[in-house]
């Protein structure tokens, strides 16, 4: 697959440590995205940064590159023990922490830098063993990091680089006290390289930067519109009775390679999953009640393509780096305007195009005016013909066993006017290799 770049700035021309450049090249990264092109020269000069960029524009690679380069070009503190981290990367959710770790591993494979994870919902002993084996870069959620700190597994006296990712989300989830607890146990701000990245640089985020960073430079990559010009947005006004049939019909028409379907409640997500599973779709469910191991497995299946549809609450809307999501369905319009932007930001990433389809139903249409005011444009409306919707929906299931039911072969077309109808053959069942 051809990689798309958005600037002409090459990583190799930034003066990075050769080992960092080698890691980037092995992963196919040659050109910078705008946030990388703006942030990296500042960070390489030793200046702290508070960066704002639209979701999916490469913030993670920017701070990982800067962190690894700083560790490779700056001597460790004299007397530091191998179990004492030199850099710490804080994330609001365990899913994001895992994604950052997975992105980091191939970049440091040949550098000698050791990364370790610390997050809740996973074996304490397993993570402890990893930390006791030595750690340079600690990646995790604040709660588990504090747990290990209070158990004296490590101290923060040798921290030379700090990353706070999704800072606005940290506030939303109530983690600011934890963040301040950790900052106050590190060396003074001027003795470390500090990086804060956020989808928005609100007043409270800027205040946090002022308190715990050393004269950070603000770097902002302002999108042409908040939702991204590569995302095709579409809005329907279904009745509550038509919503499920409309969703299934649009899925049959669009035939997305990889789609996320968002709903506002765990109960609604479970209901959507049950209907789609009954109809033979390869669908996963991601809510706050799903155990961590299962969540990781579902995300792995979705990323690798053995699951085509992911039904999720907003737990999946922020921070997860899932490549090549072609469609996002807002089954429910979110109550928070920013969540709309973060949801549809799962598609149209890194130069690719994407399609967002939203339902303004009887329950959530009230949220639309505030969303459109926030994104500063109206969402194009499409009509649908209720008589063209799928009528023979099977009864929802509660277990994955019914996923093998045979798919229907023709659904007609739900959209009115000149919109395309579904004339594609049904997707062939996935071929399983024989043992």
Swiss-Prot record:
Domain of life: Bacteria
SMART domains per UniProt: DEXDc (SM00487), HELICc (SM00490)
Function: DEAD-box RNA helicase involved in RNA degradation. Has RNA-dependent ATPase activity and unwinds double-stranded RNA.
Name of this protein: ATP-dependent RNA helicase RhlB
Quaternary structure, from the entry: Component of the RNA degradosome, which is a multiprotein complex involved in RNA processing and mRNA degradation.
HAMAP family: DEAD_helicase_RhlB
Domain Helicase C-terminal: from-to ranges: 245-390
Motif interval(s): DEAD box: 165-168
Keywords: ATP-binding, Cytoplasm, Helicase, Hydrolase, Nucleotide-binding, RNA-binding
Catalyzed reactions: ATP + H2O = ADP + phosphate + H(+)
Lineage: Bacteria, Pseudomonadati, Pseudomonadota, Gammaproteobacteria, Vibrionales
Annotated EC: 3.6.4.13
Name of the encoding gene: rhlB
Enzyme class label: hydrolase
Pfam families the UniProt entry points to: DEAD, Helicase_C
A single BP term in Gene Ontology: RNA catabolic process
GO molecular function: ATP binding; ATP hydrolysis activity; RNA binding; RNA helicase activity
Compositionally biased spans, kind Basic residues: 422-435
GO CC terms, sorted: cytosol
Annotated spans, Disordered: 395-435
Keyword Hydrolase among UniProt keywords: yes
Motif residue range(s): Q motif: 9-37
Annotated positions binding ATP: 53-60
SUPFAM superfamilies: P-loop containing nucleoside triphosphate hydrolases (SSF52540)
Main location group: cytoplasm
Domain Helicase ATP-binding: 40-219
Organism per entry: Vibrio vulnificus (strain CMCP6)
Subcellular location: Cytoplasm
